Amino acid sequence: MKEKIPFYNEKEFHDMMKKTKKGTFSGWYIIDKDNKSVEFSGNFNRQFKLNKPVIPVNTEYVTRKEFNEYKDSNDQRLTKIETTLAAQGEQIRIQGEQIKELQIEQKAQGETLKLILQTLQKMSDRLNKMDVRLDKLESK
């Protein structure tokens, strides 16, 4: 697809004039976006032909509407990411609270287990004392 753009009132024309210092051009330049080439249609003066200015073909221009659409889509994508991150943060916070509760419960169970072991040890000591007494009684 070829696009015909007038040189007058274009930024590229002024940039080209700065590069060549002198030079006049009347006509059009045609950008072929498929081949990324530039064709000229019009009259050059001698100085303009000698300096052979290079036109940046690979640069692409975006309209304000296209930019706003891109910006809006980007903003929507970012808000989606923010909401998912917020939801994940909330889940992590809830899981952290659950872990703390489980740790507290585990500590309580550990303490009860220690108490049970202490009572069993006391019972074992009593039984040993009773065995010793029985042995003494039997030996008499």
Curated annotation (Swiss-Prot):
Annotated Pfam families: DUF16
Domain of life of the organism encoding this protein: Bacteria
Record family assignment: Belongs to the UPF0134 family.
SUPFAM superfamilies listed in its UniProt record: MPN010-like
Organism: Mycoplasma pneumoniae (strain ATCC 29342 / M129 / Subtype 1) (Mycoplasmoides pneumoniae)
Protein name: UPF0134 protein MPN_094
Database matches in InterPro entries: DUF16 (IPR002862)
